[in-house]
């Protein structure tokens, strides 16, 4: 596939005059194009759902979720991965972002790194990729050599391979298990895929990581009950979440949170289930961390004791 054949490299007929518009009209043009992104993502929801449903069983067996990309695509992967530990309380090694050119490429563009096919492979070798892992190759064009090299190696290892591209690429179907292709069309500025393509990638990765974490029991209702309350803002959020989940009084919430070292999930179960810390911990372990399941188990245990 040549550069001219890529949709993301096309010239946008709607923005040909953007250099002659007023600031407000220029921004309206950009905004009009941006509105197309969530609609493009909506069309690929079935593929996103398939990816989530195939990632979760692997993670339950000890697998990791790994994002691989170059340039903007790599940075977006790192951004999403880096937010998982504080948001969902997971180990920093569970969701990993890898960028062509290494960490220095996060701040400074290393454009030549994307052409390194072997680099994509080697970076996955360096993190000891296994068949339990899931690898998402992120590329606006769908043909970035670094990303293709990584996906090819992941396929060889037996890992789940997912392609997140903004162009169709039938040439990689043999190395990609799940293809996610939000087609956002030509960019406002020709070839500037940090714009619509990057936004689409961000939306999709948000959906994948959030969906996976929900299915791993990291969310109760719509509360991030495994957050790490590492500063005052997050401690305040923790108190509010326990309040919303339990309706308990402030003094009880404060006491239980202090007793659990601000473990929101444990605090909610202790209050809702009216139980001691040790029993709540045991039920959570039995329920694989799912609060709703732990509450059901408590009721079953009580029925068995009657």
Curated annotation (Swiss-Prot):
Protein name, UniProt field: N-acetylmuramic acid 6-phosphate etherase
Protein family membership: Belongs to the GCKR-like family. MurNAc-6-P etherase subfamily.
Alphabetical list of InterPro entries matching this protein: Etherase_MurQ, Glucokinase_regulatory_CS, MURQ/GCKR, SIS_dom, SIS_dom_sf
Record key words, sorted: Carbohydrate metabolism, Lyase
NCBIfam families: N-acetylmuramic acid 6-phosphate etherase (TIGR00274), PRK05441.1 (NF003915), PRK12570.1 (NF009222)
Sample GO molecular function, one term: carbon-oxygen lyase activity
Organism annotation: Caldanaerobacter subterraneus subsp. tengcongensis (strain DSM 15242 / JCM 11007 / NBRC 100824 / MB4)
Record keyword DNA-binding present: no
CDD domains per the UniProt record, alphabetical: SIS_Etherase
Signal sequence coordinates: none
EC id: 4.2.1.126
GO biological process: amino sugar catabolic process; N-acetylmuramic acid catabolic process; peptidoglycan turnover
């Amino acid at each position: 596939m040549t550069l001219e054949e890529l949709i993301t490299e096309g010239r946008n007929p709607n923005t040909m005059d953007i250099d002659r518009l007023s600031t407000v009209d220029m921004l309206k043009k950009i905004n009009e194009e941006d509105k197309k992104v969530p609609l493009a993502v909506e069309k690929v929801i079935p593929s996103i759902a398939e990816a989530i449903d195939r990632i979760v069983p692997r993670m339950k067996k000890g697998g990791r979720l790994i994002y691989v990309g170059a340039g903007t695509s790599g940075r977006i992967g790192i951004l999403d991965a880096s937010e998982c530990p504080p948001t969902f309380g997971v180990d920093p090694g569970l969701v990993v972002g890898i960028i062509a050119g290494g960490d220095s490429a996060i701040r400074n563009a290393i454009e030549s790194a994307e052409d390194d096919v072997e680099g994509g492979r080697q970076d996955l070798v360096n993190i000891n990729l296994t068949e339990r892992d899931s690898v998402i190759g992120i590329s606006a064009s769908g043909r970035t050599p670094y990303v293709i090299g990584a996906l090819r190696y992941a396929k060889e290892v037996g890992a789940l391979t997912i392609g997140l591209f903004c162009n169709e690429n039938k040439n990689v179907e043999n190395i990609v298990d799940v293809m996610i292709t939000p087609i956002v069309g030509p960019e406002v500025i020709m070839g500037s895929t940090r714009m619509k393509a990057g936004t689409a990638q961000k939306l999709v990765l948000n959906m994948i990581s959030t969906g996976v974490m929900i299915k791993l029991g990291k969310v109760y209702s719509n509360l991030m009950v495994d957050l790490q309350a590492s500063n005052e803002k997050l401690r305040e959020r923790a108190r509010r979440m326990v309040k919303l989940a339990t309706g308990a009084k402030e003094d009880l919430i404060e006491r239980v949170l202090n007793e659990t070292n601000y473990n929101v999930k444990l605090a909610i179960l202790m209050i809702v289930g009216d139980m001691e810390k040790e029993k709540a911990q045991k039920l959570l372990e039995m329920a694989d961390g799912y609060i709703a399941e732990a509450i059901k188990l408590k009721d079953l245990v009580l029925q068995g004791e009657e």
